[in-house]
Amino acid sequence: MTYSFIVPAYNESSRIRPTLNEMLRYTAEQNWDAEILVVDDGSRDDTAEVIREYARAHSQIRLLQNPGNRGKGFSVRNGMLHARGDICLFTDADLSSPISEAPKLFEAIRSGVDIAIGSRWLRAELQTERQPLYRQAFGRIFNLVLRLFLGLTFKDTQCGFKAFRRAAAQRVFPLQKIERWGFDPEILYIARRMGLKVAEVPVLWAHSEGTRLHPFRDGMRMFVDVLHIRWNAFTGAYSAPAAPAADRM
């Protein structure tokens, strides 16, 4: 079994080193045949150069660069469509969920599901540091909107810790349209329409103050994205087959 870890990164030069060090340490400890794909989303700092430095020293690290700043959803799609592993997992650059939680998702996939998504709310006691109350409130409201408009009944669609069988990723991500924060419910909606099996798995998680999600601006965009998902479904955008194609730089 081979593994691909996708890490979307935007202006992460201050914290990408400890993240890569921990991922290298843990994957070696587990003796995994694994690659780490860091997708630089047009960073204005030296994120890309730091990753190149690591890639020169560690053959399992690869750098992908987006054509400018396109958003987290674009970065995840780009990484997934370049991934070579049998199981592909994307994780946030701050490792809000420790990489040591990955075996929980891998075990769910080995048990027969196509996609395993980390959840902060199936067992809330696993949150070692919670979000501010206003962000928790927004999350609950957004979750209700997803239930009403998209029929997604997961307790947590937004945790940035999700694993896919490669075959499932190659079916879902070519159809993804949303490039920024609202992509998570879109890929889950597409997966459900395809009849793919999705498991929600409780994971350790800690809030990071360095998050780049703007609660009002990006929150409003995410609600608009839900309407876009409904429109895309209505117009058949998620029905036509699409050939896997990734953006390279």
Where are these regions (language model features)?
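Conserved donor nucleotide-binding strand/loop of the catalytic core
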Residues: 34-37, 48-82
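Acidic donor-diphosphate engagement hotspot in glycosyltransferases and nucleotidyltransferases
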Residues: 19, 47, 76, 100-102, ...
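Acceptor/aglycone-binding surface of glycosyltransferases and processive sugar-polymer synthases
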Residues: 66-82, 87, 99-181, 207-217, ...
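Hydrophobic helical membrane-anchoring modules
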Residues: 1-3, 144, 149-152, 175-249
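Short, well-formed alpha-helical segments that are part of the catalytic scaffolds
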Residues: 12-27
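A conserved acidic beta->alpha catalytic loop
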Residues: 40-49, 95
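Donor nucleotide-sugar binding loop of glycosyltransferases
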Residues: 12-15, 43, 72, 98
